[in-house]
């Protein structure tokens, strides 16, 4: 079950990087709040 662990680590890492960039730079998509 090593593949499952590696997949989880990969997804979690990409998720952290994505959220870091997402919250640092507000998306230009029409955000209506």
Curated annotation (Swiss-Prot):
It comes from the Eukaryota. Keywords: Chloroplast, Membrane, Photosynthesis, Photosystem II, Plastid, Thylakoid, Transmembrane, Transmembrane helix. Belongs to the PsbT family. PANTHER family: PHOTOSYSTEM II REACTION CENTER PROTEIN T, PTHR36411. GO terms for cellular component: chloroplast thylakoid membrane; photosystem II reaction center. It is found in: Plastid, Chloroplast thylakoid membrane. This is Photosystem II reaction center protein T. The chain crosses the membrane at residues 3-23. It is a single-pass membrane protein. SUPFAM superfamilies: Photosystem II reaction center protein T, PsbT. One of its GO terms (biological process) is photosynthesis. InterPro entries: PSII_PsbT (IPR001743), PSII_PsbT_sf (IPR037268). Found at the monomer-monomer interface of the photosystem II (PS II) dimer, plays a role in assembly and dimerization of PSII. PSII is a light-driven water plastoquinone oxidoreductase, using light energy to abstract electrons from H(2)O, generating a proton gradient subsequently used for ATP formation. It holds the Pfam family PsbT.
